[in-house]
Amino acid sequence: MSQPPKILLLYAHPEPQDSVANRVLLQPAQQLANVTVHDLYAHYPDFFIDIHHEQQLLREHQVIVFQHPFYTYSCPALLKEWLDRVLSRGFANGIGGNALAGKYWRSVITTGEPEDAYHPDGNNRYPMEDLLRPFELTAAMCRMHWMHPMIVYWARRLQPDVLSSQARAYGEWLASPLPEEER
């Protein structure tokens, strides 16, 4: 059996102490040798991103996981800054920008609303699949494989056993993230 691929888990939450769901989700990742958990807010509290360091981390990993809360139909500000600065032309896209080609992108998102809020008749009027399209397009721009996102709806209100079950499933996926035909 081959080694599991190296995973870079980019965690972006500006108030991690307030997010029980994200703390629980991170627990299995922190136990796996093939996963590098990189807390962007802990690493860059001043938002001064070391672009070369971040690009080197990306080069060293095959699967990139973006774990964050869903803020204003997007991601927290530091992750947006990271995406704009690190995934630069000539590195991740454009002429000569092939560093991420063939790697995998998976978004792991927590929301403050239930799943039915992301529906034409719901508060947000659109399904989550549509709202995540900018991330999917960014992955495509970088020539990365878009993996089906993991969405933890209504994260603050989940019963502990449901949250534990989702964290367990997340941990199992992290241990073997690639599609079966590529393992």
UniProtKB/Swiss-Prot annotation:
Annotated organism of origin: Pectobacterium carotovorum subsp. carotovorum (strain PC1)
Membrane topology: Peripheral membrane protein
Catalyzed reaction equations: a quinone + NADH + H(+) = a quinol + NAD(+); a quinone + NADPH + H(+) = a quinol + NADP(+)
Enzyme class: oxidoreductase
Record GO terms (molecular function): electron transfer activity; FMN binding; NADH:ubiquinone reductase (non-electrogenic) activity; NADPH dehydrogenase (quinone) activity
Signal peptide coordinates: none
Family named by the database record: Belongs to the NAD(P)H dehydrogenase (quinone) family. KefG subfamily.
Protein name from the UniProt record: Glutathione-regulated potassium-efflux system ancillary protein KefG
GO biological process: positive regulation of potassium ion transmembrane transport; potassium ion transport
UniProt-listed Enzyme Commission number(s): 1.6.5.2
Lineage start: Bacteria, Pseudomonadati, Pseudomonadota, Gammaproteobacteria, Enterobacterales
Subunit relationships: Interacts with KefB.
Described function: Regulatory subunit of a potassium efflux system that confers protection against electrophiles. Required for full activity of KefB.
Subcellular location: Cell inner membrane
Keyword Oxidoreductase: yes
Database matches in NCBIfam families: PRK04930.1
Keywords, alphabetical: Cell inner membrane, Cell membrane, Membrane, NAD, Oxidoreductase
Cellular-component GO terms for this entry: plasma membrane
Highest taxon, organism lineage: Bacteria
InterPro entries referenced in this protein's UniProt entry, alphabetically: Flavodoxin_fold, Flavoprotein-like_sf, K_H_efflux_KefG, KefG/KefF
